Amino acid sequence: MYLVVGLGNIGKEYKKTRHNIGFDVVDIIAEKYNIEINRQKFKGSYGEGRIGNEKIILLKPSTYMNLSGESVIEAANFYKIDKENIIVIYDDMSIDIGKLRVRGKGSAGGHNGIKNIIQHLNSDIFPRVRVGIGQPDENVVNYVLGKFSKDEREIIEKVLAMSAKACISIVEDGVTEAMNKYNGVKIEV
């Protein structure tokens, strides 16, 4: 069983912002596998389904980004999911737009949502899909809570689809295979 977590902030004003990439990827997976994310529990919205023979729980924490660990630990404990089977999808400023990076473990890298998840799980050993949003020329908060330009949005839509495929690959083939397949790929207009 896998817990697939998309990080983001709740509220219409955050829809389609850089910081909500995780929510967007979870929505793509939900659509592909006909999983309704319409249940409220674990301080978030979630749905249950299958990818092949694997049961998956899709979770969108409603705690705001910096407290995402509260939601993740509640769902993981309830379903008794191993940390190695918790996949977290989130935005990453250290990666260029058009790229993603799959990792099996690692530090928070300055991302407060991941930092909170690491604290609550008491471990940094869980797979993640880091989606590049590029470096800001402006205030970081304004940047991550801002929307993509039209040109960026064209690239991001393709990256979101690729990120969903990377998550599915982790479930079906394992982290190493997903890393080999998706790390280093760059999508351009």
Curated annotation (Swiss-Prot):
Cell compartment(s), UniProt: Cytoplasm
Protein name: Peptidyl-tRNA hydrolase
Main location: cytoplasm
Family: Belongs to the PTH family.
Stored NCBIfam families: pth
Site (Stabilizes the basic form of H active site to accept a proton): 91
Residues binding tRNA, per UniProt: 14, 64, 66, 112
Transmembrane segments: none
EC top class named in words: hydrolase
Enzyme Commission no: 3.1.1.29
Biological process, per Gene Ontology: protein quality control for misfolded or incompletely synthesized proteins; rescue of stalled ribosome
Example of a GO cellular component annotation carried by this entry: cytoplasm
